[in-house]
């Protein structure tokens, strides 16, 4: 028995971005350097001493100077929400400054005003892999407890400044990714190969306390704020029915969901005691940490690109391609050009798993297909991209989202990743495109930065206009 594809009337359709991947203007109007400005090869690549010309993020797609043009295109698609991040080092250039950079604050005022003009709700990530470089070099990032105070000053500043312009906030992007990418996720300067589990989990404790503190401060400044956490969402399948594979699935799942457990329940889960004991980890708590952690989030948000397989067989374990947590390849799934396995039903699964676990509203804030796009001229002489592959990917995933809603999941909204082409976080390429809008910029630095609507632009516009009824089963 089938049902009509149905989404709530208040469903927040939109798109998602990150400051470091699309703003550009990395050193304009008082902005300081972030950890991204010396990472030209992506999340897992080597860093450089200073910003280099091959770092595509320094210019990005120049949203900083073209935000009006881009927001107009988002409005044409009918966006109800637009996810963006505030570049921390645009507000506090060194991270530990006492006084914020007014020009940085003014820029986001203008962006939020422009969104408001079109009736688009901003969804703002406070920290999206953008730790100020000074905090990384001088303090070793979140490994140092001092960052809680610097983050508190930053969030208090932006919450106060934008309290009447922004309702929806996310504290950290994919906070659980710090396990695998401590530099990008937590700004930890110590090389990953030399970083102890003690220091890694202590850093994550600092982030969790800071996140809960942001929830507390935000609700004090404006009780109407809706503040969520954001995790890298990846459902885990056992590779085989062997009990050892199921135990490994449980371990991998807990490693990932530990962060959401703390955000949603306000305390550490008991299962972490064993991990800490077996790895000689002793978290240093301050006397008020437990009370601060009790400030739970209003909703759980997550990214979804792929599922994963877990196995206890060491010979089968290998670093699969993917967004940090790929695990073992699933023999039943096809993969994208970048090796990311495509699993629409996995999205339905994780929606149900997260809602069953937390019974809090959920928000899909990243989902999409990175692919090589070819710009062509259509019969009317307009430049476009015939990205039927992207349409199919998104359609198939959204059908499964509708299934999850029918299952009983409370879902606030859906924002596709990279709604306009931007620089990839994982590989730092522009060749890997996600958007409904093609940006004429290439990995050799060439291009006009002109914007062109892809075929998927009008497809998504119709999906939003019909509140999902135009989707095909």
UniProtKB/Swiss-Prot annotation:
InterPro entries: Glyco_hydro_1, Glyco_hydro_1_AS, Glyco_hydro_1_N_CS, Glycoside_hydrolase_SF. The active site is at 174 (proton donor), 366 (nucleophile). It is an enzyme of class 3 (hydrolase). One of its GO terms (biological process) is carbohydrate catabolic process. One of its GO terms (cellular component) is cytosol. Keywords: Glycosidase, Hydrolase. GO terms for molecular function: 6-phospho-beta-glucosidase activity. Pfam families: Glyco_hydro_1. It catalyses: 6-phospho-beta-D-glucosyl-(1->4)-D-glucose + H2O = D-glucose 6-phosphate + D-glucose. Its EC number is 3.2.1.86. Belongs to the glycosyl hydrolase 1 family. This is 6-phospho-beta-glucosidase. It comes from Clostridium longisporum. The gene is abgA.
């Amino acid at each position: 028995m089938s049902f009509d594809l149905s989404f709530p009337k208040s469903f927040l359709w939109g798109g998602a971005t990150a400051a470091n991947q699309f703003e550009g203007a990395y050193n304009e109007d008082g902005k300081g350097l972030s950890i991204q400005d010396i990472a030209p090869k992506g999340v897992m690549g080597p860093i450089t001493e200073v910003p280099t010309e091959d770092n595509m993020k320094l210019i990005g797609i120049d949203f900083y100077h073209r935000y009006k043009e881009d927001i107009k295109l988002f409005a044409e698609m009918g966006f109800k929400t637009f996810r963006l991040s505030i570049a921390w080092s645009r507000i506090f250039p060194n991270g530990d400054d006492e006084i914020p950079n007014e020009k940085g604050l003014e820029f986001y005022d203008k962006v939020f005003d422009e969104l408001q003009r079109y009736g688009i709700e901003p969804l703002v990530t406070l920290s999206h892999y953008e730790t100020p470089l000074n905090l990384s070099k001088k303090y070793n990032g979140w490994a140092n407890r001092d960052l809680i105070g610097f983050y508190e000053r930053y969030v208090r500043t932006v919450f106060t400044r934008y309290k009447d312009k922004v309702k929806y906030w996310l504290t950290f992007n994919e906070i659980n990714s710090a396990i695998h990418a401590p530099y990008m996720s937590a700004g930890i300067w110590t090389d990953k190969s030399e970083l102890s589990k003690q220091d890694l989990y202590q850093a994550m404790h600092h982030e969790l306390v800071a996140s809960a503190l942001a929830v507390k401060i935000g609700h004090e400044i404006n009780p109407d704020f809706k503040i969520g956490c954001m995790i890298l969402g990846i459902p885990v399948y056992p590779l085989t029915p062997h009990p050892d594979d199921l135990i490994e699935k449980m371990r991998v799942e807990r490693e990932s969901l530990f962060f959401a457990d703390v955000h949603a329940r306000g305390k550490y889960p008991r299962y972490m005691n064993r991990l800490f004991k077996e790895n000689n980890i002793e978290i240093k708590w301050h006397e008020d940490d437990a009370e601060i952690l009790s400030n739970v989030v209003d909703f759980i948000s997550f990214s979804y690109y792929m599922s994963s397989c877990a196995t206890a067989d060491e010979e089968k374990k290998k670093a699969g391609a993917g967004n940090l947590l790929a695990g073992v390849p699933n023999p039943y799934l096809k993969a994208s050009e970048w090796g990311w396995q495509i699993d629409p039903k996995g999205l339905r699964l994780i929606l149900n798993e997260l809602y069953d676990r937390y019974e809090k509203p959920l928000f899909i804030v990243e989902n999409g297909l990175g692919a090589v796009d070819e710009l062509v001229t259509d019969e009317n002489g307009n430049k476009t991209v015939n990205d039927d592959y992207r349409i199919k990917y998104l359609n198939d995933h959204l059908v499964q989202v509708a299934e999850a809603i029918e299952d009983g999941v409370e879902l606030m909204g859906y924002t596709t990743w990279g709604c306009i082409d931007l620089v990839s976080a994982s590989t730092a390429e522009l060749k890997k495109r996600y958007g409904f809008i093609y940006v004429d910029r290439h990995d050799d630095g060439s291009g006009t930065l002109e914007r062109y609507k892809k075929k998927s632009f009008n497809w998504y516009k119709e999906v939003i206009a019909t509140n999902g009824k135009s989707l095909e089963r």
